[in-house]
Every structure is written in structure tokens, then in C-alpha cells.
Curated annotation (Swiss-Prot), chain A:
Protein name per UniProt: DNA-directed RNA polymerase II subunit RPB7
Main location: nucleus
GO function terms (MF aspect): single-stranded DNA binding; single-stranded RNA binding; translation initiation factor binding
The species this protein was found in: Glycine max
Gene Ontology terms: cellular component: P-body; RNA polymerase II, core complex
Family: Belongs to the eukaryotic RPB7/RPC8 RNA polymerase subunit family.
Subunit structure comment from the entry: Component of the RNA polymerase II (Pol II) complex consisting of 12 subunits. RPB4 and RPB7 form a subcomplex that protrudes from the 10-subunit Pol II core complex.
One of the GO BP terms on file: nuclear-transcribed mRNA catabolic process
Primary role: DNA-dependent RNA polymerase catalyzes the transcription of DNA into RNA using the four ribonucleoside triphosphates as substrates. Component of RNA polymerase II which synthesizes mRNA precursors and many functional non-coding RNAs. Pol II is the central component of the basal RNA polymerase II transcription machinery. It is composed of mobile elements that move relative to each other. RPB7 is part of a subcomplex with RPB4 that binds to a pocket formed by RPB1, RPB2 and RPB6 at the base of the clamp element.
InterPro entries (alphabetical): NA-bd_OB-fold (IPR012340), RNA_pol_Rpb7-like_N_sf (IPR036898), Rpb7-like (IPR045113), Rpb7-like_N (IPR005576), S1_domain (IPR003029)
The keyword Nucleus belongs to this UniProt entry's keyword annotation: yes
Lineage of the species this protein comes from: Eukaryota, Viridiplantae, Streptophyta, Embryophyta, Tracheophyta
Length: 176, 444
């Protein structure tokens, strides 16, 4: 799920960045520092969307660095237990399949794939219904439900299921 | 100012939705007790602390009503569902079946399939059973392949001998590796030569087997070699096992292979790596293309590269082994008396092997004591009968010296007199070798 939230961060800036571009320098450093990072608390910071407020800078003894408290708006992505996500299948094997929703790694084990779908090995391994109408293979887009999440300092792991109504393939690359 | 600045990367009042922030906070408190905000501190002199203290979640009900989204309700259902789950395995330390967070690190790691994946014994055997049925339905077995000296030979660039330096100008393009066989891997400071016939070998073998790579090399090396051998990822996708994935040091084991042992063949030049699975092993004659590789095994001869030579493309070691594989595969699937799942490829392998020297009656003459037992065992596995006393039924005298009493006897009685390498070659090539190539000369 995406959230638009306000976060705060103390930014340290070298004196060479002071001057009339100070604000721009602060913002670009902020974007460089936080976008694409993952925090256990908020998930992935997808994009900085705006600056709420830049507080008064504090000059530090000795170094001349100045610390600015910056409040910024950003879009974060964090999956939750129970959430329905759309993801792209990255690997299919006899244990189940792995999928990605942005930077999130999701595993759907064959325990959580409908019983009427069977694993087919070969150079394009897949799970297929007995009548052949539905097929999950690499690059398929699937809708799945998250049943477990683990957010580490740098990575997010999820356990997903497609064993429920309205879950499963939403776009089969083989048919387009 | 001596005070350290304190950063707080924490939700403050958002213009968009306070509900979300509260929800987020609840959810975080509930689901990731291990992710301390300290981990987020990434800059050396920045200390982060979170202003909003994590609320303690007594029960899941507290989250109810904190947002208008349907997610909470689903969340509630998912959490309340009490399932008696055996936790067959884990991904990111969560059960792959119920999603519950699991403590400890039990089970076997399958990092070669995906980072963070572990499976328990029962789950492994369940997967092996179901997979076995479908695989046999496709008339396939499992095949585990070693890399070094079996499918290819690698050397550090620094270890190329002066007579081999001409190779530096003969390497093939990395842009389309499927066409080449000699590659310089600059970033790994290495040169790799693929064994002649390897591409046809893999293509043919893939029709009969589900294939794994299993190397004592490390993971980056293994993946790099897999890319050279299988640029399209048709054969070894997520089936590249390196020493980083094994469960025992200096040993290879089938415990990390998701195939039943009765259906696995192994091709490796190092017998002692497979102590527990010798019956599955097809021992490969070592491929020494580079001088460094010869030296490593104590050979003082010139390398193939130094001789500007190579194994034969159509009749080299891999081509010969492919014929054996076809024979074993054919025998496994074509005998109709019992159920497929009850068959054992190890028995088929040993029966094919036992025909190689079938009908040969061997007597050894003055073979070094240390070498004798293994040589005798090898000959017997190849189907030969080994005697200790001369006898009219003897067909071959195996000796290293033509001047022994038994050697004289062989010449007099018109029996074959061969060097022990005759047995070893038959063992490598699964074929009785022409005796005239293994004649022993009289010692001066
Ligand atoms: Mg080897
Ligand atoms: Zn479980």
C-alpha cells in the first residue's frame, strides 16, 4: 500500500552549498539520500513530493557543517498483511513462485496455489489448470493476498496466497 | 555547541491523513518488533530517534476503525485465522504456508533458489515425491553436473604459462557466448575453456534429464560459468548449487537437490566429494586444458593449451559419456516389468557398468599393493572376474612390468598383457578399450 506521509530528517550540509541555491541543494541531497531506501518503519520511500518546512540551521563547532531539520512529504510503499497486491512473477518452480511488486519480494508456495493448478516443468516452468485455461509463468501478472510481511532495514519479504476468490492471473504474457 | 543533532524520520502531522499515520504506526508496532529505528541511521554522525513512541498493541482490535479502508477488516481476518500449520518451510523467516513469523533457523537452506528460502525435511520429501511422478511422466531423470575439470577448465590469468599466452589473443566474444568456447573474464581475472562437445552434450542431456550444476566453487563463479554454458537459462535456471549452498564442508550432497536419490545421476571428476552417493556417480576423466590445472594435480606434462591441442569434439570424454547416459536412460524407461517409481537408476547404472568388461578374466601381476584393491574393485564393477592364480580361463594379465613371471606366462599362452590404465580407461569411457593401446614394454 502506498502512503503519502510527512517525515522529518536532519540534513547536514557542507558550507560550500550555502548561498542562494541552498534550498535546491538541500532538496536534491534529500532526494538522493532517501528515495529508493527502505526503512523498517515506513517501507520503501518511493518519491519525495514536497517540502513542508526547513527549520533553522544549526552550525556545528569545528566542522562548519550546518544541520537543517527538514520536514518533507513523500510517498512510501509498504505491504500489509491482508492487503491485495498486484505483482509480476519472476520465478516459477516446484515449490511455488516468486513475484515482485516494486522492490518487494513475495513468495507464493504451492500450498497457497489452488489445488487445481499443477506444476509443469520444462524450460518455461509454470502452474496450469487441468483444462489449460489459466497459466502462471515468468512475467505473468498476478493478483495476490499478502499473509505475512517482514520488513528489515533494507528489504521487505512477503508471503502471498492466490488460494482465494478473485486472486490469480490477471494478465498472461503468453496470450498477449 | 557540543550537542549532537538528533534526527527524527518519523511521521508528523500529515496534511493528507492522520488516520493513515496512526494506522501505520499501529501496524508497525504489531508486525515488526525487530525493526528498531536505529537501523535506519545511515549517516555516520546522524543519530536518529523516533519521536512518536510505538504504541503497544494489546490486541488486533485496536487497529479497528483507524482507517476507512477495507484493509483493516481483512487484516483482522487474516490474523484471527488460527491454523494448525506444520510450518513446512520459511521465506524471510516467515512460514511459507501460514505467513507466521518463525524463530530460529531450522530446515535446509535453499539459497540457490532464492535468498531467504528454507525447507523442512518433510516438505523436501513431499516435493521430491510429487516431482518424481511428473518427471517420470516426461521420461526424465535428474542429472547433477560438476563444473571444473568436468564441463570446463578455468585458470587465473596470472597462472597462464608463457607457452599459453597466445590464448589471450584467441578468446571468444562475451557478447554472444553461445558461439565460443574460450573466454577471458576480466573482472574475475580468469580464463575459462569449455570442454569440447559440451554444448551438444547439454542439449542432448536436457532431453533426458532435469539438470543441476553442483560445484565446489563459490556462488559468483558458479553463476558466471552457468552463463557461459547456458546463456539462455534453459537448463540450469535456479538450479546452480555452489559450495555456499552445501550442508557439509568439502562434501557434495543430494540433500539440497530436490530429486529422489533413486532417480539422480551425477557427473563429476572428484569421487571423494560424493562419499554418500557413489552409486549415483559417473566418474569423469579430468579435463586439463591449462597448465595450472595440470600442476594442481601433480602432472609434469604439457597442458593441452601448451600443445595447441584439445580433446576430440566428436569422440572425446563428453561424447562418450553421452552415449552412456542414453543407454542408462533407455534401460531405465524401457524395461516394463515393474512400476516406474520403484526403479532405481543406481541399479541401472551398475548393471550397465558391469557389462563393460563382461567376460574378461583378469589376473594382476606385481601391482603396487596400495593400488591393487581399488583396481580390483574397479575391474569387478566393470564386470570382470579377478583371479589370484593363473588359470586357463584368464583372458588378461594386468601388469606394469613385462618381465614378471605372469607376464611371461601371458605371452606364452597368448593372453592379453595390458597396463592397469586399460582398466581405468574402460572405467572412464564405459567401454572396453583396444588392448593394443595399453601394451607394456619390457623394462631395460
Ligand atoms: Mg571438478
Ligand atoms: Zn505455518
Amino acid at each position: 500500500m502506498f502512503f503519502h506521509i510527512v517525515l522529518e530528517r536532519n540534513m547536514q550540509l557542507h558550507p560550500r552549498y550555502f548561498g542562494r541555491n541552498l534550498r535546491d541543494n538541500l532538496v536534491s541531497k534529500l532526494m538522493k539520500d532517501v528515495e529508493g531506501t527502505c526503512s523498517g518503519r515506513h517501507g520503501f520511500v518511493v518519491a519525495v513530493t514536497g517540502i513542508e518546512n526547513i527549520g533553522k540551521g544549526l552550525i556545528r563547532d569545528g566542522t562548519g557543517f550546518v544541520t537543517f531539520p527538514v520536514k518533507y512529504q513523500c510517498v512510501v510503499f509498504r505491504p500489509f498483511k491482508g492487503e491485495i497486491l498486484e505483482a509480476v512473477v519472476t520465478m516459477v518452480n516446484k515449490m511455488g513462485f516468486f513475484a515482485e511488486a516494486g522492490p518487494v519480494q513475495i513468495f507464493v508456495s504451492n500450498h497457497l496455489i489452488p489445488d487445481d493448478m499443477e506444476f509443469q516443468s520444462g524450460d518455461m516452468p509454470n502452474y496450469t489448470t487441468s483444462d489449460g485455461s489459466v497459466k502462471i509463468q515468468k512475467d505473468s501478472e498476478v493478483r495476490l493476498k499478502i499473509i505475512g510481511t517482514r520488513v528489515d532495514a533494507t528489504e521487505i519479504f512477503c508471503i502471498g496466497t492466490i488460494k482465494d476468490d478473485f486472486l490469480g492471473v490477471i494478465n498472461d504474457p503468453a496470450t498477449v | 555547541m557540543k550537542q549532537m543533532s538528533v534526527v527524527a524520520d518519523s511521521p508528523v502531522h500529515s496534511s493528507s491523513s492522520d488516520d493513515f499515520v496512526a494506522f501505520l504506526d499501529n501496524e508497525l508496532g504489531a508486525s515488526s518488533p525487530d525493526s528498531s529505528p536505529d537501523k535506519e541511521a545511515e549517516s555516520q554522525d546522524e543519530l536518529e530517534s523516533v519521536r512518536i513512541k510505538r504504541r503497544k498493541i494489546e490486541s488486533i482490535d485496536e487497529t479497528e476503525g483507524s482507517t476507512s479502508e477495507g484493509i483493516i477488516k481483512q487484516n483482522l481476518e487474516a490474523s484471527v485465522e488460527v491454523d494448525v500449520c506444520t510450518h513446512p518451510g520459511s521465506f524471510g523467516s516467515m512460514c511459507i504456508r501460514c505467513g507466521q513469523k518463525l524463530d530460529g533457523e531450522s530446515g535446509v537452506t535453499f539459497g540457490y533458489i532464492h535468498k531467504g528460502l528454507r525447507l523442512h525435511e518433510e516438505e523436501i520429501s513431499r516435493l521430491r515425491n510429487t516431482d518424481m511422478k511428473s518427471l517420470l511422466g516426461h521420461k526424465k531423470l535428474y542429472f547433477v553436473l560438476d563444473l571444473d575439470h568436468t564441463l570446463l577448465n578455468s585458470t587465473l590469468l596470472a597462472h597462464l604459462s608463457s607457452e599459453e599466452s597466445y590464448l589471450l589473443n584467441q578468446t571468444d566474444s562475451l557478447a554472444d557466448v553461445s558461439k565460443g568456447s574460450l573466454f577471458k573474464l576480466e573482472h574475475m581475472h580468469m580464463m575459462t575453456k569449455l570442454r569440447p562437445f559440451v554444448r551438444s552434450f547439454l542439449k542432448e542431456a536436457s532431453k533426458m534429464f532435469e539438470m543441476y550444476i553442483y560445484t565446489m566453487g563459490d556462488r559468483p563463479y558458479a553463476l558466471e560459468m552457468a552463463k557461459l554454458l547456458d546463456p539462455q537459462g534453459e537448463y540450469f535456471n535456479a538450479k546452480v548449487i555452489s559450495r555456499d549452498d552445501g550442508t557439509q564442508k568439502h562434501q557434495k550432497g543430494l540433500d539440497v537437490v530436490l530429486g529422489q536419490e533413486s532417480a539422480v545421476l551425477i557427473l563429476d571428476d572428484t569421487e571423494h566429494a560424493w562419499m554418500k552417493h557413489k552409486d549415483n556417480l559417473i566418474l569423469m576423466e579430468r579435463y586439463h586444458f591449462f597448465a595450472s590445472s595440470c600442476r594442481q594435480f601433480g602432472f609434469n606434462c604439457k597442458s593441452l593449451a601448451e600443445l595447441r591441442n584439445d580433446e576430440d569434439e566428436t569422440d572425446g570424454a563428453l561424447a562418450k559419456i553421452l552415449r552412456v547416459l542414453k543407454q542408462v536412460h533407455c534401460t531405465f524407461f524401457n524395461k516394463h516389468q515393474d512400476d516406474l517409481v520403484d526403479r532405481d537408476v543406481r541399479q541401472v547404472l551398475s548393471s550397465v557398468r558391469s557389462k563393460v568388461l563382461g567376460g574378461c578374466v583378469i589376473i594382476f601381476s606385481r601391482i603396487f599393493h596400495g593400488a591393487l584393491p581399488s583396481l580390483r574393485k574397479m575391474a569387478e564393477q566393470l564386470g570382470a572376474t579377478c583371479l589370484t592364480e593363473v588359470d586357463p580361463s584368464v583372458t588378461h594379465v594386468v601388469a606394469t612390468d613385462a618381465g614378471t613371471e605372469k607376464s611371461w606366462w601371458a605371452v606364452k599362452e597368448n593372453k592379453f598383457l595390458v597396463h592397469p590404465r586399460w582398466i581405468e580407461a574402460a572405467n572412464y569411457f564405459w567401454e572396453k578399450q583396444p588392448e593394443e593401446n595399453f601394451i607394456i614394454k619390457k623394462k631395460q
